[in-house]
């Protein structure tokens, strides 16, 4: 009756976050660490062509499958990377 409050639009803030692409770096070979090689945390098989998610790596196949379902990662529940930068890697040693 007289107690109705105007509803604010909470989706406006989520739309602004959704529109901005998440940028990540593409790696042809995994970085070696003290604890061994990095693998795709979803399928555990791929160790090449990895994409860095928030705190883990995903292969291109698993990333595409997750992006078809939603914008969130199934492992860490953060936004999946949508824009990938490929660094130029030398094909031969410098002379």
Curated annotation (Swiss-Prot):
Keyword Nucleotidyltransferase assigned to the entry: answer is no
Motif extent (PTAP/PSAP motif): 90-93
Give the domain of life. Viruses
Plastid is among the record's keywords: no
Function, as annotated, reads:
Plays a crucial role in virion assembly and budding. Expressed late in the virus life cycle, it acts as an inhibitor of viral transcription and RNA synthesis by interacting with the viral polymerase L. Presumably recruits the NP encapsidated genome to cellular membranes at budding sites via direct interaction with NP. Plays critical roles in the final steps of viral release by interacting with host TSG101, a member of the vacuolar protein-sorting pathway and using other cellular host proteins involved in vesicle formation pathway.
Where is the segment annotated Disordered? 1-23
What is the protein's name according to its record?
RING finger protein Z
UniProt PTM = Myristoylation is required for the role of RING finger protein Z in assembly and budding.
GN (gene name)? Z
Family designation = Belongs to the arenaviridae Z protein family.
Renumbered to this chain, the positions carrying a covalent lipid of the kind N-myristoyl glycine are: 2
Where are the RING-type-classified zinc fingers? 40-76
What Pfam families has UniProt attached to this entry? zf-P11 (PF03854)
Q: What is the lineage of its organism?
A: Viruses, Riboviria, Orthornavirae, Negarnaviricota, Polyploviricotina
> Can you quote the domain comment?
Late-budding domains (L domains) are short sequence motifs essential for viral particle budding. They recruit proteins of the host ESCRT machinery (Endosomal Sorting Complex Required for Transport) or ESCRT-associated proteins.
């Amino acid at each position: 009756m007289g107690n109705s409050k105007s509803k604010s639009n909470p989706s406006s803030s989520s739309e602004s976050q959704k529109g901005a692409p998440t940028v990540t770096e593409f790696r042809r070979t995994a970085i070696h660490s003290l604890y061994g090689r990095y693998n795709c945390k979803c399928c555990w098989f791929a160790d090449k062509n990895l994409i860095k998610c928030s705190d883990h790596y995903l292969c291109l196949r698993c990333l595409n499958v997750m992006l078809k379902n939603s914008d969130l990662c199934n492992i860490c529940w953060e936004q999946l990377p949508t824009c990938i930068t490929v660094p130029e890697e030398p094909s031969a040693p410098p002379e």
